[in-house]
Amino acid sequence: MNNYLRKLVEGQHLTEEEMYKAGLLLLNENILESEIAAFLVLLKAKGETAEEIYGLVRALREKALPFSNHIQGAMDNCGTGGDGAQTFNISTTSAFVLAGAGVKVAKHGNRAVSSKTGSADLLEELGVNISSTPNEIDYLLEHVGIAFLFAPAMHPALKRIMKIRKELNVPTIFNLIGPLTNPVNLETQFVGIYKRDMLLPVAQVLQKLGRKQALVVNGSGFLDEASLQGENHVVILKDNEIVETSIEPEKYGFSIVKNEEIRGGNSKENAKITLGVLSGEKSVYRDTVLFNAGLALFANGKAKTIEEGITLAAHSIDSGKALAKLNLLIAASNEKLERVN
């Protein structure tokens, strides 16, 4: 590890292979916590490259729980977190809208790290059992159309690093790579990131991971979601080509909504917001979810245009299908799925 730390101190980038090997060392129980913390802070100070991100993703996926990966067409819409905006759980709420529109959603997530309520906290409050095994997750994806992958359970080797991340209390490379380490073999992905300068590197990593289509967004105000506040910077991966562009919410009929207007709270407060959106209540929360789910449906290919994606998202909610997916997941995740274990 000393060689890698020395390179980072000197401001040098690591190669993909060096980062892969460093990643395996980070997951080794014999490494000192001080070395892990130093590595994360130095890497953040230098700035992460696509090669470094992909190298670490390789190491983490190698050490993750094994999946059969027989499920075809799965998508994730997990964001990086780390924007400090304290918004409600936009991507988790949107996941049920996607599922209601017919997308298989493998939602990878965690408890709160830099926010009040993480996706796991919200789902637990709603009554979802977040402790599903890989076999159970496969079952849920096939029969319910949505499953939650609790990151610490999927990546047991990360236990010590999670503790150090919490103590550091600043975004690290692990915020960036969270959405990239989903152990399910995804075909498409919608990723919100808090660092605008990482849009292209993250898209390049998604390309290396073999995604058929993907959309990476940095929202107005550096939100790790698409924002109704103003211009959103976007990178689209399609047909193995990467295109950089920007998206204005007004073009799609939305009113401007400041990011402060969609702040969330604790898990109970955020659960109330999510249930309100899925129940069809008109609000700035609903509009934010429609925008994000619409973009995700476009990224998935379920919709040919963003406009069509927003229309499909609205139908998923207003038909009751999105809320039905939540209720199905609550019921199925709490069953004794002995037949699949």
Swiss-Prot record:
Pathway annotation from the record: Amino-acid biosynthesis; L-tryptophan biosynthesis; L-tryptophan from chorismate: step 2/5
GO molecular function, one term: magnesium ion binding
Cofactor, how bound (note): Binds 2 magnesium ions per monomer.
Coiled coil: none
Positions that bind Mg(2+) 1: 91, 225
Protein keywords: Amino-acid biosynthesis, Aromatic amino acid biosynthesis, Glycosyltransferase, Magnesium, Metal-binding, Transferase, Tryptophan biosynthesis
Family indicated by similarity: Belongs to the anthranilate phosphoribosyltransferase family.
Subunit structure of this chain's protein: Homodimer.
Protein name, UniProt field: Anthranilate phosphoribosyltransferase
